[in-house]
C-alpha cells in the first residue's frame, strides 16, 4: 500500500475537499490510502469519515512565515513516521510551497502542486504568495491544474516537464429523475444529446 499525503486548508465541505472525498470513497483503499495535512486549527466536517476510512489527519503549525522552519520539520517528521507515504499532493495554491519544500527535504520523489483557482487573492499575504509562487515549481516534481488558466495564474511557468498536467473538472453523466434546481442544462455545451449534468 502507498499513502498519499494531501495538504489542504482543513477538511470542511469546500470544493477541493469534497472532490477529494469523492475520490477517496471510491478508490481501492487496500492499495492507496489518503492522509491529510490540515493547516487550520478548526476541525473539519470530514474528519470522522476520513478516520473511519483509514486515513490520518496531521495538524500543521500553520501557514505563517514565522512558522516556516517548524513547518518543514513537521512535514519531515510526518513522512519519516510512515514510510508508506510516497506522494505529497499540495492543494494550497502558492502556499503549497511549505508542504512541498518539507516533502523535498524528507526525500519524497513525487511532489505535486495542484492549482484549483484562477486567481491569487490580493490580501495582506499577497506579497508572500507571489514570492512562494516563484519558488513553487522548483519544489514540485509535478505541476497540476484544473484548467490551463489556473496553471498560468497560480503556478509560475517552467519549461515543459513530463509530469505537468491539466485536469478538467469531472462531470457526472448519471441520469437523474430530479436534478437539483441549480443544475445547468449543458447537453449542448458538452456535445451530449440529452440530459442534465452538474459538477459532482
Each predicted region: which residue ranges?
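Membrane-interface segments of envelope glycosyltransferases acting on lipid-linked substrates or membrane lipids
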Residues: 1-200
Amino acid at each position: 500500500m502507498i499513502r498519499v499525503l494531501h495538504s489542504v486548508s482543513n477538511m470542511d465541505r469546500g470544493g477541493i475537499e469534497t472532490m477529494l472525498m469523492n475520490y477517496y470513497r471510491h478508490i481501492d483503499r487496500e492499495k492507496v490510502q489518503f492522509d491529510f495535512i490540515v493547516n487550520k486549527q478548526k476541525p473539519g466536517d470530514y474528519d470522522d469519515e476520513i478516520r473511519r476510512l483509514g486515513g490520518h489527519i496531521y495538524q500543521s503549525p500553520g501557514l505563517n512565515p514565522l512558522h516556516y522552519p517548524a513547518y518543514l520539520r513537521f512535514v519531515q517528521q510526518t513522512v519519516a513516521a510512515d514510510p508508506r507515504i510516497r506522494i505529497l499532493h499540495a492543494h494550497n495554491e502558492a502556499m503549497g510551497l511549505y508542504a512541498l519544500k518539507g516533502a523535498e527535504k524528507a526525500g519524497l520523489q513525487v511532489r505535486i502542486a495542484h492549482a484549483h483557482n484562477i486567481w491569487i487573492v490580493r490580501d495582506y499575504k499577497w506579497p508572500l504568495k507571489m514570492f512562494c509562487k516563484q519558488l513553487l515549481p522548483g519544489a514540485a516534481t509535478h505541476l497540476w491544474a484544473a484548467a490551463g488558466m489556473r496553471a498560468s495564474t497560480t503556478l509560475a511557468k517552467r519549461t515543459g516537464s513530463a509530469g505537468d498536467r491539466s485536469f478538467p473538472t469531472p462531470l457526472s453523466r448519471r441520469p437523474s429523475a430530479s436534478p437539483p434546481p441549480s443544475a445547468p442544462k449543458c447537453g449542448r455545451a458538452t456535445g451530449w444529446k440529452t440530459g442534465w449534468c452538474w459538477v459532482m
